[in-house]
Amino acid sequence: MIRFNQIFIILLLSFPFLISFETTDIDDKTFASFQSPEGINFTSYTPSWDEDRLKDLYKELLLNKHGQEISELNEVRILGGTHSSTNTKGSYHSLTKTIVLYQGNQYETPVDYRETLSHEYGHHFAYHYFPTHHLPFSEWQRIRGIDVADMRWDAFWNYDERYHAFYPQEILADDYVLLYGATSEVESEDVMSNEIFYMRTQHENQDIPNVLENKKLHSFLEEKTGLAIDSSRIIESPSLIEWNDQTIRFSVSSRDHIAYRLNLELINQNENQLVELYEVSSHDTNTLTFNLQDQDIINLTDYDYALISIDIVDLTTSIGFETDETRVSL
């Protein structure tokens, strides 16, 4: 058993290097290349990406908040084809400090890779500042508020795409996307069409605590990296404060340009009725009110209980999440 534990610990400590030996199919022909002032090499292996597009990709990379760790990134490659048999758009190799972007024949502009590039740079960020984040019981894991048993620690010897969202490496990379990554504004006109809620930038793992309101984690990251988290990235979950036949009221952060969609499912033994209500916040209030009077709802007393959740999107960044579902007796 002691021998097994020793081998296990060695493998865990070696993980950042082991994953870097993953092979990728790279065409022999280089179509374009560019070196940034920091010394980052941008290399295209597809005719779809010329030098000008590589320079634009570099500008896209800079939209991700960064510190001196960016100078240690060696290369960003763009391949025309796919990665093995998967449909992934990117990967990061920690030994060579290289980001590889796939499907360059299909995605031909930097904005097409915005979220992917942020996520892969998030891996670079994570291994630079938190080199042991892939280990159980790390300081990051404790402050992140996720139980060790709720995460997968076997990516390097038993990787399974089904558990991608539960590997600590992927959780921290997505944390970076939401707290430091490049953002895009969305139009308020798209609220009623629901498009912004489907297209928002959100954490892949919606079963873990909301990173956008974990202020203790924010302070920890800022202290360790020296990179401040913009106040616009902080979005707290609404709290139900009042419910009656006319309105449903929540307390929220006093911020404007936050779109909310209330998902209200009314249930009894015979039927379910789903109602969606929309509101956009203003800066001068910390109360969110949904009006039930104008909705095509049968008398609430005809139902036994309701299930409610709220979809949230910051219109200035497209970042958001869905709250946990809450059951309310009627």
Identify what each model region corresponds to.
Residues L101-Y102, E139-Y163:
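Substrate-binding clefts and substrate-entry loops adjacent to catalytic sites
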Residues I99-L117, H164:
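Short pre-active-site segment immediately N-terminal to the catalytic Zn-binding motif
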Residues Y121-E139, A182-S184:
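Catalytic Zn2+-binding segment of zinc metalloproteases
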Residues E38-L95:
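Auxiliary, metal-adjacent structural segments of Zn-dependent hydrolase domains
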Residues M1-I10:
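N-terminal Sec-pathway targeting helices
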Residues Q6, S14-I26, F31-A32, T183-L330:
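Pan-zinc metallopeptidase signature
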